[in-house]
Amino acid sequence: MASGSNWLSGVNVVLVMAYGSLVFVLLFIFVKRQIMRFAMKSRRGPHVPVGHNAPKDLKEEIDIRLSKVQDIKYEPQLLADDDARLLQLETQGNHNCYNYLYRMKALDAIRASEIPFHAEGRHPHSLMGKNFRSYLLDLRNTSTPFKGVRKALIDTLLDGYETARYGTGVFGLSEYLRYQEALSELATVVKARSGSSQRQHQSAAKDLTQSPEVSPTTIQVTYLPSSQKSKRAKHFLELKSFKDNYNTLESTL
């Protein structure tokens, strides 16, 4: 009876150790999978490095080109000139149903206005995102064609832009026409000022390139009369004879 109880206790110990080892292995696998999962979610790049087995030069070229991807921003044209949806605006009916078309036309109108938003180069992606307002206000206070433009005009343009792009209110035909009028006025002012400044630069460059006329240099030769020439020669001979007499006198002493 005692030997049977000892055998059962030994079996229980073995079972406990086996179950404990199994639970430990399962917990280890679970924790490892969770760690790998969070590590993969936190990584921005691919799970395998790009160009892992590529040559060194090719890998560097791949890294250089991939680093330029984050700087690429493109704002496509929303409505083409031959878009069939534009015909819906010409049909009779409730124009409020096509507010989204006026919003798209408002965004495309900025590119069609040919306003040099990128002339300064400080905001190369000024039409992307919310810095459109800060970009124009910044240009308005600097020495650019935007300087001195009426603040009300820029505010009307920017309010219409933000309403068309981000607003949830109504943006119909009247709002679009008001926005288009402000954009056309701003484009006219900027083009006129940029044209005048360009003409001033051209005139200044022309003045710098034109060299002043150089008057020919004249050499004035003064001829002495013969009497003065003879006097100079006589004085030279007297000076030479005096020097010779002085040298002979010094040698005799």
Swiss-Prot record:
<keyword id="KW-1133">Transmembrane helix</keyword>
<keyword id="KW-0496">Mitochondrion</keyword>
<feature type="transmembrane region" description="Helical">
    <location>
        <begin position="11"/>
        <end position="31"/>
    </location>
</feature>
<keyword id="KW-0472">Membrane</keyword>
<dbReference type="GO" id="GO:0016020">
    <property type="term" value="C:membrane"/>
</dbReference>
<dbReference type="GO" id="GO:0006909">
    <property type="term" value="P:phagocytosis"/>
</dbReference>
<comment type="function">
    <text>General regulator of phagocytosis. Required to uptake Gram negative bacterium by macrophages.</text>
</comment>
<keyword id="KW-0333">Golgi apparatus</keyword>
<dbReference type="GO" id="GO:0005739">
    <property type="term" value="C:mitochondrion"/>
</dbReference>
<dbReference type="Pfam" id="PF07406">
    <property type="entry name" value="NICE-3"/>
</dbReference>
<protein>
    <recommendedName>
        <fullName>Protein C1orf43 homolog</fullName>
    </recommendedName>
</protein>
<dbReference type="InterPro" id="IPR010876">
    <property type="entry name" value="C1orf43"/>
</dbReference>
<dbReference type="GO" id="GO:0005794">
    <property type="term" value="C:Golgi apparatus"/>
</dbReference>
<feature type="region of interest" description="Disordered">
    <location>
        <begin position="194"/>
        <end position="213"/>
    </location>
</feature>
<keyword id="KW-0812">Transmembrane</keyword>
